Amino acid sequence: MARKVIDVRIVNAATAEQESFIKELSMELIHDVFPLYFSELDIQRFKKKGVLSLNNHYYQGTLKEAFQIMACLQMIHIILTKPSPHSDLSDQAIFEKNSKMLNDFGIYFPFAFSDFQKKTNKAFFGQRRLI
């Protein structure tokens, strides 16, 4: 008689406060950071397309995921609000890593580091269309 092996894993769920904080960090990026780089019209388009919204298909709601998402959002915020964020290649690598992680967790973040250039943002002047 064959024995069945059942793989059971116990994970901790993210708290309501953590999920609320993720939404707060997302709104902070949209309302405080994006205006430094994009027009109000572009930001409205981002909202309609679901930028920084959570896709529950990928997000499992675990404590680990919540902490990683919060850390990614905070790192992107820090990099984009630095006095000269485009002068350091390590900033670009950190930005790209955190951007990829957000997308892997189901948070729609279609931006590249080069999309965040003050006053000369080329993303919406024909060179690269994000959405």
From Swiss-Prot:
InterPro entries: Uncharacterised_YhcU (IPR020355). It holds the Pfam family DUF5365. It comes from the Bacteria. This is Uncharacterized protein YhcU. It comes from Bacillus subtilis (strain 168).
